Amino acid sequence: MPLKQNNDFTWIKRKKHSFFRRRNLILLITGIIIIGILTLISSAVSGFVRSKGYSNTWDFVETVISNYFSGTKASPETISLQIENKEYKKLEKNRQQALDRGVIVNDMDGEFVPATLEYKGKKMSIKLRLKGHMTDHLQEDKWSFRIKMSGANRFMGMKRFSIQHPGTRGYLAEWIYHELMKREGIIALRYKFIEVTVNGRNWGIYAVEENFENELLENNNRIKSPILRFNPDLYWINRLNELKDVNSFDEYATYYSANPEAYREEEGLKDSTWKANYLKAIALMESLRSRKISVSQAFDIDKLSKFHALIDLVGGEHSIDWSDIKYYFDPIKNKLEPVAY
């Protein structure tokens, strides 16, 4: 009997040691995994922090906290949009169509509807539509709008402008971009931040971005003359076809297939001086595209050089994509110059 008890004790002791060995092994493996995960997270956070220009994580956290509390003291200007229910439902329908499709197509989703904009106690008639191409412009309760003022009304000196989630333009980065361009004599858009309410609901802080009108030229001390681009409609139709898995020829949606055109072309062509400048500008764009003339023959090379240098500085490569870039025709030098956008 004592022998059996001794054997039982030895078996229990062996099992106990085996359990602790397994437990220690599991704890060791778990610890290694946790340390590995924390190392990866730390590395990712450090990489993100460095990409934002901070030397270490603490500087980043300290700045974010400081900026947050500074932001609570801000008192941005406010506008109020009133959209009748019938018109609001049209916007909702267009928004849902674009979300289902995966891209905003202006011919399908760009219907302007009447509304009222109130600013500093003054109510002004406007027309607005959904704005943008990518669906980040259609976030819940943060839709982007293109707005055009009616008659002689102006908002902050602008006849046409957009309001959009600041994140669609990199928050403060876009404001800095335009300020730098303006300082170097490049045509720059008015770009501000405001608080927006829609039908009595606060939709938060929006970025206001000027559109391409004569007021833009006046604000940049330029003579009235065409602002031009290469029409990107075929490019976006091609993007839509790709989303639908429809085969199409990419060459029909490239820079070489896009028609050069001017903003407010129909209105401008009624003015003989504007029309003459328009024809000169189109000829320059076509000659440059077909490589019949050099870049320096088509552009104010000093302004173009500064434009590209600043784009490199701020990482704004999207501004030189052919579907985004805009040009102004200088009627004195008979050359094109870039418009910051």
PLM features: residue spans?
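Phosphate/dinucleotide-binding and metal-coordinating scaffold of catalytic cores
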Residues: 2-341
